[in-house]
């Protein structure tokens, strides 16, 4: 493999990592801040992809982004209503919505399982036209993905410091304290899940426009990928402020995609990639714990040696 091919693989991994990092940031909000494990991520990601694809095929690539985010917001709203108004466990609520979204996504696609955007204008082609004749013309995909990730990081950094953002963080830490402060945790949970759903759908929309196709399985395994990326980011940068943790989520997504790309280049069978994802998740979860246990193991070994 020559050097240009290596750089091409790295750039593709960066682009895909930045696009998927938007989903990781959504999981950061719902899982890390709200302490809610939303298993509707896969279906919501596909919802954003197919909604954005259908809207872009109608000739509105920019409107496709907002349509996808609106669809994701509705998905998050339904998940939160099932949890807060109907007393359904968060895990079960996510599974129910994820199951329902499969039928909804097929309906949006008009009964098809694949939508092609080969002859459709996308936000990436718009960026390419905007940068035509500039030194950055060849990096239009990377710049578009970077802009999306940067905007979401900036939004979360500012939003989580507002009154509502602080209430969302408090809800995840101690719901009883939030109730005693005359704040309805159902409202904060709903707001948080709606925002997370819109981010997940945005990520799906961007990926569909990036690869110029949307299929019914585009979001399969996305919750696993996002969780692994989130844990990798927290391992790399550790625990810090909101901005640092959000940046860590983005870095984790890029690292995961790089590892995934290497696995593909090693001619690994496609059916083994899910196993690779599972192994990465296990390592991302266990490494922080093993770090804390390492001094204990060393002390035990020293005692045995003595």
Regions found by a protein language model. Name each.
Residues 75, 138-218, 223:
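Helix-loop-helix "hairpin" substructures at the membrane interface of multi-pass membrane proteins
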């Amino acid at each position: 493999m020559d050097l240009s091919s290596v750089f091409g693989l790295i750039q593709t991994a960066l682009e895909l990592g930045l696009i998927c990092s938007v989903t990781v940031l959504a999981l950061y909000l719902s899982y890390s801040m709200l302490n809610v494990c939303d298993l509707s991520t896969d279906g919501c990601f596909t919802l954003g992809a197919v909604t954005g694809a259908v809207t872009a095929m109608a000739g509105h690539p920019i409107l496709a982004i907002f349509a996808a985010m609106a669809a994701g917001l509705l998905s998050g709203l339904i998940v939160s209503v099932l949890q807060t108004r109907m007393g359904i466990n968060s895990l079960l609520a996510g599974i129910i919505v994820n199951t329902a979204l499969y039928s909804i996504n097929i309906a949006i696609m008009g009964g098809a399982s694949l939508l092609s955007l080969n002859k459709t204008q996308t936000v990436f082609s718009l960026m390419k036209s905007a940068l035509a004749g500039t030194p950055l013309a060849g990096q239009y995909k990377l710049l578009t993905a970077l802009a999306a990730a940067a905007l979401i990081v900036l939004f979360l950094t500012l939003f989580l410091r507002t009154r509502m953002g602080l209430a969302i963080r408090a809800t995840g830490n101690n719901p009883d304290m939030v109730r005693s402060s005359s704040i309805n945790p159902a409202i904060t949970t709903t707001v948080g899940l709606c925002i997370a759903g819109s981010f997940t759908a945005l990520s799906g929309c961007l990926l569909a426009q990036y690869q110029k196709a949307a299929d019914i399985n585009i979001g399969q395994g996305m919750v696993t990928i996002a969780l692994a990326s989130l844990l990798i980011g927290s391992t790399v940068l550790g625990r810090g402020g909101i901005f640092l943790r959000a940046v860590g989520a983005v870095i984790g997504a890029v690292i995961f995609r790089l590892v995934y790309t290497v696995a593909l280049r090693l001619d690994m069978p496609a059916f083994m990639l899910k196993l690779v994802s599972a192994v990465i998740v296990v390592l991302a979860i266990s490494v922080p714990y093993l770090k804390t246990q390492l001094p204990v193991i060393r002390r035990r070994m020293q005692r045995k040696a003595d």
